[in-house]
Amino acid sequence: MLPLRDSVPGRTTPYVTVGLIVANFLVWFWELSSPGVDVHVFRDGYYPCALHGPCHLPLGFHALPWYEGVFTGMFMHAGWEHILGNMLFLWIFGNNVEDTLGHVGFLFWYLAAGVVAMAAQTFVTLEFAGVHAASVPNIGASGAIAGVLGAYFVLFPGARVLTLIFFIIREIPAVWFLGIWFLLQAYTGGISLLHPQSGGGVAFFAHIGGFAFGVVTGLLLAARRREPRQLYLR
């Protein structure tokens, strides 16, 4: 399923969403420069093993400290399909969440979502996948963007998403689109635990952790918006 647009018009100019997209593309073009994407990924990606080693990296490479790698990795991508897909999702769903949180709030919230997503993937990798899997660089904005999807899921339950499904374009409820997306992540994540070779290099638990962060914080925001104003008598 590929989202084309949603039905919720933005109330403000999404400066931060646009800025994040631009930043991701700037980093991607930097990755494409000499000495190439693979070298940049191995040098500047986030490694779960950096939390408490050892890391088994190719000769000549050293893992960044985790508190640096978690942010550099959040803006790096492995290929055109990777970055274009992520930025499409951020463009469609990010502006409405930014409307809700405000520009500055959304920026810090987005970064926090990315950190929580990386933490979820790190926990699963260290607990279940072993040392060698922990020495594989984790990159991509998808964990933070999964947070955006989770928040959108609870903040805009009546929204609809124009969706390309194979060769058919249909408008479907956002809760269906995002719910199916999450269930696919959970299913494939579970399969990857049972059969690690089937993971295809995708950080499913970063997606799951990011989405959960978005749902929880979105529910808190929704509850605050529904709270009645306190009346005081003098």
Give the role of each language-model region.
Residues 1-234:
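A detector for small-residue-rich transmembrane helices and their helix-helix packing motifs
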